[in-house]
Amino acid sequence: MANYDIIIQAGQSNAEGCGYGPVTKEFVPSPNAFYLNSEKTVDVIEGLLKIEYADVPFEIVPAEERTINDMLYGDFSLTFAEEYEKAGLLKEGRKILMVRAAIGGTGFCVKQWGIGMQLYEKLLEMTEYALNLDGDNRIVAFLWHQGERDSVEEEAYKNYKALLSEQMSDFRARYGAEIPFIAADFVNDWKSKYFEQCERVVQITRDLTKEMGNAGFVETSDLKSNHQQNGEECTDDIHFCRESLHILGRRYFKAFQDIINK
């Protein structure tokens, strides 16, 4: 029987973890950290994502970087969990469980995130599953990275604050009013090319973290994209590279510490 400290990780592709390339220090998995995954298929049909969750049980597996086509892909929740454990916050007899609910390319504007929408409903289902596992389980943090999809849709930013605020208010009403919520800026390599529309959504998120209480915002302007880290042959400018994801997780943890130490 495990007693889990549960970390929610939700949003789109930078929360899913799409960064690759060289790193200063290789990530070493902890025997105390696990993922909660859902099996799904994601297809693009007429320019829109079609997400289908398999009717199979959720899976708990060791938390580690994914290998795709012989390349390691980072995930900022891993270094967040690493720092959480190093700081002595994981008490004896407890484990970390990361609820992996992010899917690339998703947004509020296309009715995937938000109260009653498919991804948020699946997130709630996964959260309930995690909390109801045998043992003493508790949610310790909600890590969010999203907004790129809503930045590129004309006028979508006008509803972004209300939809994100309502979603997080609903989550806290269900599971705890003081659950720390942490979000972050986009990859600057991509954001700088579409600055006006991106900054509107980023500033909304930044402001919301100041208003909602027990929340933090992580700045990322110095973090490299896959394109910047891996050379001109790589054109992926929207995703944090693997090294940046390692750093990002530590910054999320610093924001978390600032919240819990107030």
Regions found by a protein language model. Name each.
Residues 1-262:
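Cell-envelope and extracellular/periplasmic
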